[in-house]
């Protein structure tokens, strides 16, 4: 390990933003880029009727619907730190893609709408974070709108998510009377005006809450309310404990309004000062340190057609150790072949730049013509396999039928590419030539339909089919597995990677089959090979 490598790793931050739909996540992403100098002007974010679209929502279906359905990777600098930000899908039907993103980050930022508190999707994503003990910072957004009282919001988070809250900033007023935030750990007050579309300048700083100037700036009633709140918090709130945050048991909480630039600086400061630098990554044989000399990384996402004009596919690779150099030769372990990575890119949403070098914690894009899949590991020599990137059993199914039988080749190509991205799962029954799509949420079918038509010129009919869930099956006894296949072939299919799966018409039927075949193992998730 060189001094440069140690310094580069310490300066890296890789985090994902998670939230319920419409909590303001994409707006916050844009403001981070704005404050980091990556973009000059924030878009008219999420104005659903506006012609413009948010910088990070670049796929046409996202612009049309005003939701994020794929993961955007964005890179920017703030202070002396190099930040890799993963803007995850907020829509509940895309939790599978979000989960895969959470395997690539070192920490997460949870965005909560002050008017709604903790919502269902946030709870689901929190479960995923807890599986990995991911450190989480919380941003309570939209304080410039009428919402729940700050103390009620903290209680809501603690009760529903079973995580201790440690507020680090505190709002002054709310709704139309929102005047700024008080920084509890720096003991200073920052007042803001709505920033509109440009970066907000630093606010006025007041070190002492008893300063008469405070009342002049925000009014006596707000000043008195703030003093009372801070006195109450100093006695009742949980003090921030770095160790508890890093273990995932405590979340520091910040208040603000992303669209008006309230509280963004404090949040960015916390992300570089508190959030962890890249750490150990689990592989099948051992844990891998970012300070190791040899390069290693894994693919957590495939995105087809980022530029429809070029029909390209990009593999998103998280670097786990060593240093990446342009043109370096690596071993692609799943297929056992060496490859030269000469055209890696980094991202600012749809914009890309060629990479000469990259370090642990960075996300690079590798051009891919179908040989790279989710979960693939690249190293200089050691045959590592990083773990914890699963497929989830789908809960919704559709049969795909072509309107024009002459387009079968385009359909197969489109389905193969979309399945490798993880946008949808494809099952091919043992007893028919059907294509059956499986998804965690029904919106994935709409996205698949739109993308097949727009990117592959394929028009299909999507027919509901009587399946309720799927399980991947395996049995160490080949003779018994053959008997199982013969007895249940009407419900068996191969997934996109050729793995055998049982498609169940109901939970009762699944339980019945499991009971009758106790030596066959039924898996609810499957690691990417």
From Swiss-Prot:
Superkingdom to which the source organism belongs: Bacteria
Disulfide bonds: none
InterPro entries xrefs: EF-G-like_DII, EFG_III/V, G_TR_CS, P-loop_NTPase, PrfC, RF3_C, RF3_dom_3_sf, RF3_GTP-bd
GO biological process: regulation of translational termination
UniProt xrefs under Pfam families: EF-G_D2 (PF22042), GTP_EFTU (PF00009), RF3_C (PF16658)
Gene Ontology CC annotations of this record: cytosol
Compartments reported by the entry: Cytoplasm
Residue spans crossing the bilayer: none
PANTHER family membership: PEPTIDE CHAIN RELEASE FACTOR RF3
Function as written in the Swiss-Prot or TrEMBL entry: Increases the formation of ribosomal termination complexes and stimulates activities of RF-1 and RF-2. It binds guanine nucleotides and has strong preference for UGA stop codons. It may interact directly with the ribosome. The stimulation of RF-1 and RF-2 is significantly reduced by GTP and GDP, but not by GMP.
Protein's name according to its UniProt entry: Peptide chain release factor 3
Gene source species: Desulfatibacillum aliphaticivorans
């Amino acid at each position: 390990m060189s001094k440069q490598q140690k310094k580069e790793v310490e300066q890296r931050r890789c985090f994902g933003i998670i939230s319920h739909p419409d909590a303001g996540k994409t707006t916050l992403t844009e403001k981070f880029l704005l404050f980091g100098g990556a973009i000059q002007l924030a878009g008219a974010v999420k104005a659903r009727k506006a012609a413009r679209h948010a910088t990070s929502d670049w796929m046409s279906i996202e612009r049309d619907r005003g939701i994020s359905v794929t993961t955007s990777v964005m890179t920017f600098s703030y202070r002396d730190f190099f930040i890799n930000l993963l803007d995850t899908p907020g829509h509940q039907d895309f939790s599978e893609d979000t989960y895969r993103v959470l395997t690539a980050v070192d920490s997460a930022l949870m965005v909560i709408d002050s008017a709604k508190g903790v919502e269902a999707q946030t709870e689901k994503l929190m479960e995923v974070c807890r599986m990995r003990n991911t450190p989480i910072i919380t941003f309570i957004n939209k304080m410039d709108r009428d919402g729940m009282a700050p103390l009620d919001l903290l209680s809501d988070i603690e009760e529903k998510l079973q995580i201790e809250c440690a507020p680090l900033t505190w709002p002054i007023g709310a709704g139309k009377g929102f005047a700024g935030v008080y920084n509890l750990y720096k003991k200073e007050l920052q007042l803001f005006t709505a920033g509109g579309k440009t970066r907000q300048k630093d606010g006025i700083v007041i070190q002492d809450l008893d300063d008469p100037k405070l009342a002049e700036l925000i009014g006596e009633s707000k000043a008195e309310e703030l003093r009372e709140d801070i006195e109450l918090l100093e006695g009742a709130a949980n003090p921030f404990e770095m160790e508890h945050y890093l273990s995932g048991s405590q979340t520091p909480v910040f208040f603000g309004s992303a669209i008006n630039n309230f509280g963004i600086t404090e949040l960015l400061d916390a992300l570089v000062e508190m959030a962890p630098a890249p750490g150990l990554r689990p592989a099948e044989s051992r844990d891998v340190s970012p300070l190791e000399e040899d390069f290693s990384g894994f693919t957590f996402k495939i995105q087809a057609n980022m530029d429809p004009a070029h029909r390209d596919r990009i593999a998103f690779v998280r670097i786990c150790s060593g240093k990446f150099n342009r043109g370096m030769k690596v071993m692609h372990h799943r297929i056992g072949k060496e490859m030269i990575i000469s055209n890696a890119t980094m991202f600012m949403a749809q914009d890309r730049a060629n990479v000469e070098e990259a370090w642990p914690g960075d996300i690079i894009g590798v051009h891919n013509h179908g040989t790279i899949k989710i979960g693939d590991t690249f190293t200089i020599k050691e045959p590592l396999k990083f773990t914890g990137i699963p497929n989830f059993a789908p809960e919704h199914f559709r049969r795909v039928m072509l309107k024009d039988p002459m387009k079968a080749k385009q359909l197969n190509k489109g389905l193969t590419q979309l399945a490798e991205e993880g946008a949808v799962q494809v099952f091919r029954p043992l007893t028919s030539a059907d294509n059956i799509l499986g998804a965690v949420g029904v919106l994935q079918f709409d996205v698949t339909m739109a993308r097949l038509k727009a990117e592959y010129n394929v028009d299909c009919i999507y027919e509901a089919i009587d399946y309720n869930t799927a399980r991947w099956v395996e049995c160490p006894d080949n003779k018994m597995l053959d008997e199982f296949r013969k007895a249940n072939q009407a419900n068996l299919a191969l997934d996109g990677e050729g793995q055998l799966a049982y498609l169940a018409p109901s939970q009762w039927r699944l339980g019945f089959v499991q009971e009758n075949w106790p030596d066959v193992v039924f898996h609810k998730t499957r690691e990417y090979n």
